[in-house]
């Protein structure tokens, strides 16, 4: 079984810790993973994960994504000068990644905690969609309680990529699929109350579904409540395979091939 974790985070830029996580992932059948940024610290840790994997004897192949998520507005401000500084810092980080940079992210909109920052979030999201398009990179998109605005901006700035950790309705999933996006399902699908996620997972075509951990968050059952990591993606794979009526090996291979098409 070959597994591809299309979205995970490393919260600390600790080479020893990262190497241990990667070794456990490799032992669990993870052949590739994408380490995802979203803040200066996460971007650095994602870049380090790619470096550690390249030098390790036992590790999956690691690509990475860098970006600034919506939370950075509160941390870094939204004046013209601050926006310029953020964009420059991000582009400098991306330029140093060379062959390991596979996507721009995570980026997107989240109105759950800070709906008052909607305008600033849209502006930041739009700038990064433009940068990803300039670099010919797919995007890793977070959307929470903001799907209509997310769709609107993706229509305005045509992009390709992944709607990560999808938790929306089946109908909304179809609308993202109509724009050409892949839908990535996390361990949330194994949670007892996640009927909506399971329903959505069933409408995604075989050639557009991906799996992810979003680690260190959202550990799947039977590990819910502990820190998540890429090695645990096997549980999500097996759960979704049973849900969709296919073998775990076949589903792992399908999602691996899908991920390679969009992320490499």
Where are these regions (language model features)?
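Mid-domain alpha/beta scaffold segments of enzyme catalytic cores
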Residues: 1-264
């Amino acid at each position: 079984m070959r597994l591809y974790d299309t979205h995970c985070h490393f919260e600390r830029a600790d080479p020893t810790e990262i190497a241990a996580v990667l070794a456990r992932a490799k032992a669990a059948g993870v052949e590739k993973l994408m380490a995802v940024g979203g803040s200066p610290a996460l971007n650095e840790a994602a870049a380090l994960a790619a470096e550690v994997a390249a030098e390790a004897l036992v590790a999956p192949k690691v690509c990475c994504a860098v970006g600034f998520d919506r939370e950075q507005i509160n941390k870094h401000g939204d004046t013209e000068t601050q926006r310029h500084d953020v964009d420059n810092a991000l582009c400098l980080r991306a330029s140093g990644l060379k062959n390991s940079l596979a996507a721009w992210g995570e980026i997107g909109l989240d109105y759950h905690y800070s709906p008052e920052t909607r305008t600033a979030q849209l502006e930041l999201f739009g700038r990064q969609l433009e940068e990803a398009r300039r670099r010919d990179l797919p995007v890793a998109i977070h959307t929470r309680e903001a799907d209509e605005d997310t769709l609107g901006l993706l229509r305005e700035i045509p992009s390709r990529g992944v709607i990560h950790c999808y938790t929306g309705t089946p109908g909304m999933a179809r609308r993202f699929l109509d724009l050409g996006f892949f839908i990535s399902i996390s361990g949330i699908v194994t949670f007892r109350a996640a009927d909506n996620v399971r329903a959505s997972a069933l409408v995604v075509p075989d050639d557009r579904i991906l799996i992810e951990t979003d680690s260190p968050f959202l550990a799947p059952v039977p590990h819910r409540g502990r820190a998540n990591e890429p090695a645990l993606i096997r549980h999500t794979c097996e759960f979704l395979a049973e849900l969709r009526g296919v073998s775990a090996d076949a589903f792992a291979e399908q999602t691996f091939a899908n991920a390679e098409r969009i992320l490499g």
